[in-house]
Amino acid sequence: MLSVAARSGPFAPVLSATSRGVAXXXXXXXXXXXXXTPQPPVLDPKRPILSRESLSGQAARRPLVATVGLNVPASVRYSHTDIKVPDFSDYRRSEVLDTTKSSRESSDARKGFSYLVTATTAVGVTYAAKSIVTQFVSSMSASADVLAMSKIEIKLSDIPEGKNMAFKWRGKPLFVRHRTQKEIEQEAAVELSQLRDPQHDLDRVKKPEWMILIGVCTHLGCVPIANAGDFGGYYCPCHGSHYDASGRIRKGPAPLNLEVPTYEFTSDDLVIVG
């Protein structure tokens, strides 16, 4: 028997071989046994090198073309199947969901519904704004006690004929004059062309014998003196304005007649001013 041993070099740790020679007439048989070895370790895969040659295959080979038009369908890229393309179907009305159907048939109905909603909303907003403005304005108005003080009752029997009495009303002097028949006829005969602020005597009174005026001069706010002046009515001592028995400016710097307040005769002997 012949034994041969050979060095396997760097593979010695993992390989082992035996060869034997037998002198006989039969054919020589050689048996080789390989010991079981573990799997070699897996190395990191080779990363591709980013170069012009490696990237040229991924670029487009033909020019890119974009098509724009009213009837051109929108392009959808299906590279990712997990992305849902929005079509806004949930926000569209049922009449216009079908893209192949014309929307002109349902145009009138849709417009009518929109107009109805808009008109209803406008009416509601207007009513709400009216209520808010009304409450705001009413909050600024005078209270009941202030309104009660804004009126004054005057007993006419206390004022003799030909006399003028002064009262305090809303912080201003109030003149109530009981005119004689001569004063009534004299003031009614005055021509409007002679007046700076033309106004007939009958337009300033409700009863000719009673003349009710606010005693504030229309020039600078002084208080005139009754039964004085060149015309027997009122005279302002501040700057010399003369008024007649109807409270009309006749001479001096005052531009307007004396103001006539709002009043009402509740009886023959009682008048309420305010």
Curated annotation (Swiss-Prot):
GO MF terms, alphabetically ordered: 2 iron, 2 sulfur cluster binding; metal ion binding; ubiquinol-cytochrome-c reductase activity
A GO cellular component annotation in the UniProt record: mitochondrial inner membrane
Catalytic activity: a quinol + 2 Fe(III)-[cytochrome c](out) = a quinone + 2 Fe(II)-[cytochrome c](out) + 2 H(+)(out)
Keyword NADP part of the UniProt annotation: no
Keyword vocabulary terms for this entry: 2Fe-2S, Disulfide bond, Electron transport, Iron, Iron-sulfur, Membrane, Metal-binding, Mitochondrion, Mitochondrion inner membrane, Respiratory chain, Transit peptide, Translocase, Transmembrane, Transmembrane helix, Transport
Modifications made to the protein after synthesis: Proteolytic processing is necessary for the correct insertion of UQCRFS1 in the complex III dimer. Several fragments are generated during UQCRFS1 insertion, most probably due to the endogenous matrix-processing peptidase (MPP) activity of the 2 core protein subunits UQCRC1/QCR1 and UQCRC2/QCR2, which are homologous to the 2 mitochondrial-processing peptidase (MPP) subunits beta-MPP and alpha-MPP respectively. The action of the protease is also necessary for the clearance of the UQCRFS1 fragments.
Residue ranges crossing the lipid bilayer per the database entry: 104-140
Further comment found in the protein's record: The Rieske protein is a high potential 2Fe-2S protein.
Recorded family membership: Belongs to the Rieske iron-sulfur protein family.
Protein name: Cytochrome b-c1 complex subunit Rieske, mitochondrial
Gene: UQCRFS1
